[in-house]
Every structure is written in structure tokens, then in C-alpha cells.
Amino acid sequence: MINLRAVRVIYRYEMLRAWETLLQSFASPVISTALYFVVFGSAIGSRIEHIEGVPYGLFIVPGLMMLALLTQSIANASFGIYFPRFTGQIYEVLSAPISPTEILLGYVGAAATKSIIIGFIILLTANFFVPLQIQHPFWMLAFLILTCVSFSLFGFIIGLWADNFEQLQLIPILIITPLVFLGGTFYSIDMLPPTWQAVTLFNPVVYLVSGFRWSFFEVSDVSIGISLSVVLLFLFTCIAIVWWMFRTGYRLKQ
């Protein structure tokens, strides 16, 4: 049986830490996204009127949200578990009568919650720039939650793997950010030459952005079923990796 009190203590601690750094945790990603709207939505949008029948300013909204969700989910979760390792507080958590599942629910739940809040703030902010309408609110919410949970798990893995703050930033900067920008955030992959279209399909972020965009406009580069399958596959893969890390004590007992 899950010790909900233990989960709540970890969850509350992580959420309070976010409120103490409110400007960095919530305002910063929203301001960055707003600047993307100004630069890409206004400047480039005046030259590219429509993509697949959707005004360019509207077209980039799901991609910009996904950009913020991915980066913030990873950052929140990776720092959330790495900092206790760095300070040695993780040993207090591991020695307490708390199961790995409860530790995971506390840290990942808090990281995902912070990202979901950011997602909704960005959604509200987007309405100041474009007349936003969501065709499938249920699927939008489903992709939002699945993405935040999946990449919070991925961030948790990075936080356990990293030996220093440089490694903590290595994967997000060198891998995640390029994948997001090359994943159809600001364009449709149909605009690419056939060869690059085929290469782009190996980018998992394409399926996240495509499925999320479909929930807004019923426009996508790949089918909704494939997008959902990729998200679920990534989710269960991360769960399996975290389970292995706890089972073997990888970077937890060092």
C-alpha cells in the first residue's frame, strides 16, 4: 500500500521550492515563450500566412507549448532529484520508510505539476496574441499530461545519472533542444524535401508536436494513433529505466 503521507511530504517540499523561486520557475518560461510569439508569430507570420490552412501565428502555438513543457519537465525533475544527491539529503530519504514508488510519485508528480501549470499559463498567454480555439480539449489535456509525466520521468533519470551540474545540463542542451527545434515546432515537416522528411520521422519529438497540434486544429504530420503510441512507449520505457535504477541502486548508493 502506498504511503500517501510520504508522497505528500516530498510533493509539497518540491512545490514550495518552486513557489520560493516563482520568477524562475514560472515567469521565465512564459516570458521566453511570449518572445517566441512576437518574433515568429509577428515577424515571420507576416511572410508565411498559412500552413495547412492554419494561420502561422496559431500554427506555432502547440509547438511553443511543447517546447516549454519538454524543457521545463526535464529541468524540474532532474534538479529536483540531483540537488538532494549533491547535498547528501538523498540518504535521509532512502533511509526513511519510503518505497521507490513513493519517492518517484513525489518528485515526478511535483515536476509534472509545475510543467502543467506552465502549460496552462502559456495557453492563456497565447490568447493575447492569437484567437485560439481547441478542437479536441480532451486529447489536448491527455497529450499535455502524458508529455509532462514522461519527460519528468526522463528528467528524473538524468538527475540520477548526472555526476555534476555540467552533466545535468548536457542532455537537455545538446540533445533535447535540437530535437525540439527540428521536430516541427515552427513548421510542418511536409515543407521539407522528401529525404529530410524521412530523417525527421526518426525524431520522437515530431510525434509529440504533431499529436498535440492535431488536438488544436485537426492538422498533423503523422496520425494521432502513432503519436499517442510513441508517447506511451516513451513513458513505459522511462518507467522501466527508473525501476532498474532503484532496483540496482544505480547512482543512489554512491
Language-model segments: residues:
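Hydrophobic transmembrane alpha-helices and immediately adjacent juxtamembrane helices
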Residues: M1-P137, A142-Q254
